[in-house]
Swiss-Prot record:
The lineage of its organism: Eukaryota, Fungi, Dikarya, Ascomycota, Saccharomycotina. GO terms for cellular component: fungal-type vacuole; nuclear envelope; nucleus. It comes from the Eukaryota. Residues 161-208 are annotated as: Required and sufficient for binding to DNA. This is DNA-dependent metalloprotease WSS1. It comes from Saccharomyces cerevisiae (strain ATCC 204508 / S288c) (Baker's yeast). GO terms for molecular function: metal ion binding; metalloendopeptidase activity; metallopeptidase activity; SUMO binding; SUMO ligase activity.
Amino acid sequence: MKTEGIKSPSAKYHDMAGSQRIPHKNPHIQKVAVLQSKPNKEDALNLIKEIAHKVSYLMKENHFKVTNLVEFYPRDQRLLGMNVNHGSKIMLRLRCSTDEFQFLPMECIMGTMLHELTHNLFGPHDKKFYNKLDELIGRQWVIEQRGLYDTFLGNGQRLGGRANLRSNRYPMTGISTNTGIVRKRGKGVKLGSLHPEGISSIDRGNSPRELAAFAAERRYRDDRWCGETKNNKDQIISDNISSSLEVVILDDDDEVLPGDTLIEVIDLT
C-alpha cells in the first residue's frame, strides 16, 4: 500500500537513488519507521535508514540489538532521543523542533543514536555510561573512515566488508551524498557532548575539580535532552503512536486495520 506525501526538493534525487538500489540495511535492527503525518516522509525514511546503515558494523562489534528504530517529534523541544527497554525501541528526533520541514544535521542525529545505543547497556548517565559512549564515538569515527558496514552491499561486497569511501561519506551539515536530503545548516546539539561543535574531549591537563564540573555539566545537559530520565516516558511513547497517523506495512498481503499504529514500517532484515 502506498501513501501520498508532500514532494520535497530532493524527490527527483530520491527516485534516482531508489532505482540504483542503494543499500541501507542493518541485520541488527529489525524495523525502522517514520511519522506519516510529517512532511517529506520519504526523505525522513531514507535518513533513518542511513543512520541504521552507518551503525551496523558498530552494532555487530558490540552485539547490540534494536527491535524498532523510529522517528519521533516530541512536544518537549529539548528532547532528542529515547531508548525503551534497552533496545526494544529507539526513538530519534530527525527534524528541527521549530521547523518540521528542516532535518537536523547528520552529526547531531548520529550523536543521539550512539547515545541511545549506550542505553542498551547502561541506564543512568554515570561514569560507566560515558566511558562506553566515548568508546563508541571514537570507534564509530574509525569505522566511517574505513567505510565498514555489516550488511550485503552488492557488487561483490560481503557481510562486514568495505564500501566505497567516496560514495558513503557524508558532510557534517548540508546535503548528504547518499540521500540528497537537505539538512539544516548551523550548530546542532549532540547527546553526550559538552559543546555543539564537536564530540566531548576533556583536556587531560584539567584539575580533578574541573573534570568533575565538566562531568556534572554533561550529565545535566543529557538529562534534559535524553528521554531516559524523563518521568513521563509512557506519555512520550503514547504521543508517538497517536491515532492521527497511518500504518503502511510493506506487505501486499496485509491489510491496514482501524486502530493500528501510526508508523510506516520497513523490515531491515
